[in-house]
Design a protein with these regions (language model features):
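Conserved GHKL (Bergerat-fold) ATPase module
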Residues: 1-187
Length: 187
């Protein structure tokens, strides 16, 4: 048991150093061994050392290969944000089109994308990281989300030209004639 604890501590120290000093190398390690490593969420003795080493794709990443740590997510979090939001999906494309993700996109709030079944289970078991609570986008509180301003500005429609106005007037007149014709047929 003592040997196991010592080896675990040495491995975690090495991984912490690699994650800090050579993020690219650590991300390569993560892509190969991340699925197995995530099972470490159940190691209560080392949980505080394992959690910062977890990596996920997120809405802030340019593509599905990008990875972020929970600390990096927190560094990008909006002021007064107290949740780490996530969505479980089989792919990045599915996560992006999830209807619950729309409000987060509109408000410029980052969402972690969880592709593996163990991801969601791990975050639910961890429940918190630092002062942030893990929360699935489908369980987000609308009152909390309403506190964040929309970042996507809706494009303003260009003013209509006189020619366009004339075309709309013709269309409106045609609609009125059709509608009047329908009324006469029903009568």
């Amino acid at each position: 048991r003592k040997i196991s604890q010592t080896i675990s501590k040495q491995i975690l120290s090495h991984l912490e150093k690699m994650a800090k000093d050579d993020a690219e190398k650590y991300n390569s390690f993560w892509k190969l061994h991340g699925k197995v490593f995530k099972l470490g969420y159940s190691d209560f003795v080392n949980r505080d050392r394992i959690t910062p080493l977890l990596r996920f794709n997120s809405s802030a990443m340019e593509d599905a290969d990008g990875l972020t740590s929970l600390d990096d997510y927190i560094s990008r979090a909006r002021e007064s944000q107290k949740e780490i939001w996530y969505v479980a999906a089989p792919s990045r494309e599915a996560a992006k089109v999830n209807p619950h993700s729309e409000v987060f996109r509109r408000k410029g709030l980052e969402v972690l994308y969880l592709y593996e079944p163990v991801d969601e289970f791990a975050l639910e078991t961890l429940a918190k990281y630092k002062d942030y609570t893990f929360k699935a986008v489908e369980h987000a509180d609308s009152v909390v989300l309403d506190a964040f301003a929309d970042t996507d500005e809706q494009p303003k429609a260009a003013p209509l030209s006189n020619e366009d106005m004339n075309e709309f007037d013709k269309l409106l007149e045609t609609i009125r004639k059709v509608r009047d014709g329908e009324r006469q047929r029903r009568a």
